[in-house]
Curated annotation (Swiss-Prot):
This is Non-specific lipid-transfer protein C, cotyledon-specific isoform. It holds the Pfam family Tryp_alpha_amyl. The lineage of its organism: Eukaryota, Viridiplantae, Streptophyta, Embryophyta, Tracheophyta. GO terms for biological process: lipid transport. Gene3D superfamilies: Plant lipid-transfer and hydrophobic proteins. PROSITE patterns: PLANT_LTP. It comes from Ricinus communis (Castor bean). Residues 1-24 form the signal peptide. Plant non-specific lipid-transfer proteins transfer phospholipids as well as galactolipids across membranes. May play a role in wax or cutin deposition in the cell walls of expanding epidermal cells and certain secretory tissues.
Length: 116
């Protein structure tokens, strides 16, 4: 009987650990969709971030649950920014303009792996 109880507890512990390690970070498709309305401002074409930009980023911020989520979002934004011609002088202003606290410097040069 002790072996059965031990085996069940071991199995439950394994399943619990497995469930916690398989939580996926925020996918780039979600990041791109939520941040798409910000491209006009981030490239210097618009004079301020649109309401759609701020709403999308606020929704994205609500999905952040872990440090890995922050790092994933950072990596996605960096990858997209290269192909879109994003300019740091505009990009860095978006969090304050949209009243979003990100907890790390917003730049195309941010080292995403140092985020904690």
């Amino acid at each position: 009987m002790k072996n059965v109880v031990f085996s069940v507890l071991l199995l439950l512990s394994f399943l619990f650990c497995l469930a916690n390690t398989n939580e996926a970070a925020v996918p780039c498709s979600t990041v791109d969709m939520k941040a798409a309305a910000c491209v006009g401002f981030a490239t210097g074409k618009d004079s301020k971030p649109s309401q759609a930009c701020c709403t999308g980023l606020q929704q994205l911020a609500q999905t952040v649950k872990t440090v890995d989520d922050k790092k994933a979002i950072c990596r996605c934004l960096k990858a997209s920014s290269k192909s879109l011609g994003i300019k740091d002088q505009f990009l860095s202003k978006i969090p304050a303009a949209c009243n979003i606290k990100v907890g790390f410097p917003v730049s195309t040069n941010t080292n995403c792996e140092t985020i904690h």
